[in-house]
């Protein structure tokens, strides 16, 4: 079941804020059902093997490094955030799995702050007035079975410029509001 899948513009910078009920199917589903091409943020440790890195990069996946996986400090992701900004400035689509993990629970886990940091960093460094965040929800009947039914829901855009003034006054509060 697909809802509003035409809601992703191809002529504007878009951050997709997606949930992540399954490990590998979610990014594939987004790439199959949504246009334009999507760059997917992916757990960094799976890029350590050269053959895996090549395969993942060929399908527009790029690494992100989580502290809970043993990576220290946010500076490891500075290059990741710059990569995202470079794609957004070119009016491309970047998908961030905002819960920071996959799970089969039928509820959304707490949203991590990476998406907001990417959005505000892009706006601060490049000021794209049309930068938007589009929520995308994936839900499966079971999630752990092959040939399961997928419901893919594309929500209304959230414009980063609407949060910019709040970010300038208090970045932490604006990040929490945007999340």
How should each PLM-predicted stretch be described?
Residues 1-173:
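Soluble catalytic domains of membrane acyltransferases
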